């Protein structure tokens, strides 16, 4: 297991998560989520939680309503 703190993922893990969020998919399917979790050394639950929180942060920064999934919705 990686040197993850109780406050969240390590810098290296966040780098992997951010890359996938920004360059690959903001809404990963279960298989992709599993692969991202394995790459980052996190559980699927931790990865899913991170994506959910990061998506909410992204929505706020884009001025989108919280229930909106993407710009095209």
UniProtKB/Swiss-Prot annotation:
* InterPro entries recorded: HD, Homeodomain-like_sf, HOPX
Could you tell me what this protein is called? Homeodomain-only protein
Record GO cellular component, one term: nucleus
Kindly give the SUPFAM superfamilies that the UniProt entry links to this protein: Homeodomain-like (SSF46689)
PANTHER family per the UniProt record, alphabetical: HOMEODOMAIN-ONLY PROTEIN
Q: Name one GO biological process term.
A: regulation of heart contraction
User: What GO molecular function annotations does the UniProt record carry, in alphabetical order?
Assistant: DNA binding; histone deacetylase regulator activity
Annotated coiled-coil segments of the chain: none
Q: Name one Pfam family in it.
A: Homeodomain
Organism equals Mus musculus (Mouse)
Q: In which tissues is it expressed?
A: Expressed in the embryonic and adult heart and in the adult brain, liver, lung, skeletal muscle, intestine and spleen. Throughout embryonic and postnatal development, it is expressed in the myocardium.
Q: What is the lineage of its organism?
A: Eukaryota, Metazoa, Chordata, Craniata, Vertebrata
Q: What is its main location?
A: nucleus
Q: What happens when the gene is disrupted?
A: Mice display partial embryonic lethality and heart failure.
Compartments, as annotated in UniProt: Nucleus; Cytoplasm
Please, which domain of life does this record's source organism belong to? Eukaryota
The alphabetized UniProt keywords are:
Cytoplasm, Developmental protein, Homeobox, Nucleus, Repressor, Transcription, Transcription regulation
Give start-end of the signal peptide. Answer: none
């Amino acid at each position: 297991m990686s040197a993850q703190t109780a406050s969240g993922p390590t810098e290296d893990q966040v780098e992997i998560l951010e890359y996938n969020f920004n360059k690959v998919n903001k809404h990963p399917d279960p298989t992709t989520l599993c692969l991202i979790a394995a790459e980052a050394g996190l559980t699927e639950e931790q990865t899913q939680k991170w994506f959910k929180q990061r998506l909410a942060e992204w929505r706020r920064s884009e001025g989108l309503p919280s229930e909106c999934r993407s710009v095209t919705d």
